[in-house]
């Protein structure tokens, strides 16, 4: 449904009618993920005189609570592509890596797994991070974001079956699974501090297809209403394609407004300042496309792409109940599996006394309700690699139980004895973004090239560790089929990073420590910023949205200080060639 349809149905909407837009703003924020929502909220709320006019543009549609797809047909119908530009879920397939992300007001916060976690301090000591951006510097901004997003652990985390299953491997290596801080509401039943109605989490497990309960603390529940209540204008279904630097100062945005799946119109808007926060795929694409139209940029733009070391695997049909079947709004019946809890609740960190590049984080996952039946059928066919002998009869019975069409949520089925894992590690962040030029699209389409990405040794080590998890649960091991079964070593990531990395100067980064975009001569473009995951110059080994939030909180604060008279420092144009050689 489009914004117009939702308004006709009487739903409260954050977005404004497109016809009410102005022609010129002080600030235009492109994208409504953690970067765009936070920047707009902080700037709109700041005590500034005169108060700047702020416009936030989002290419996707608005998804009020209760409108998220929860059946496999509606989930598949909400895939974003050329014929469905307002779809919620986007799966981008490149030669070496595929990317899973969301599209809508609130960005990927609508469909992520909620985990708010701070990386190791050593991550920021990598040579590709600016020396002024350390974990200690960012800690106050982490705290600021965590407070607004209301991050905290599940109150019964250690009682959940999937967390106890994580512990079966953890104790073998002398550690334990620990509850993660997640941005999920477990207490508020009514209006939250930002005036938005919420309900407590029901443990339904549908976080990554969209929370229809209203318990997930997406940006739709906090930063976006903060921005709107403070005067920012929000427009959805509005895709920015490229930006133009105006001769007299300021910027012109070129894009298309999508009225529905079949109707769109081109538009331009002008602004003194533009904040690109369209994500690690789209912000670099906008800048690269703008370069084609004459914008001078750093030679580093389009480099440093990382999948955050993401990797997936399964321990299928083991000896213990795991309760990983999502229910959505369905009510569990007597004798059925217990609801799983949020998509991710716990983790095991492999960080003790090992080099940074060998550290990994393993997290539990659940199956959202729309995928339960398909997962049962698919994994029964794959079966996987048996890790222990003597349990074949019990496994056959559990697989048979899963084929019961009248009782899809049987607690004694194979899928409810399965663990689904997300792992994050340190990849080499050497992906590059380029443009192909098909005949039907004059500016081309962006591609990501990263030869040998999936053949990095860390992914083989992760695969072996997940096999050990499966053995600890007396399960069959199923690796990521794209990586293992077809032997392509193709990666899949839900956490794209880089492409417009932070750097000390224009030869080491595409933007400076405050997200100001470098020109090709070493200066910064006045009034052009990036605030999203594309700034992150390395893998983090943990879920990245809290780091993106902290970087944006810092960038927004510094921008407000500049508006109050505390000028930005001059960019460093004195580049050490020896430093460049050392980093090559």
What name fits each language-model region?
Residues 75-156, 424:
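Redox-cofactor-proximal catalytic regions of oxidoreductases
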Residues 93, 131, 298-443, 496, ...:
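FAD cofactor-binding and catalytic pocket of flavoenzymes
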Residues 104, 113, 533-545:
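Glycine-rich phosphate/pyrophosphate-binding beta-alpha loops
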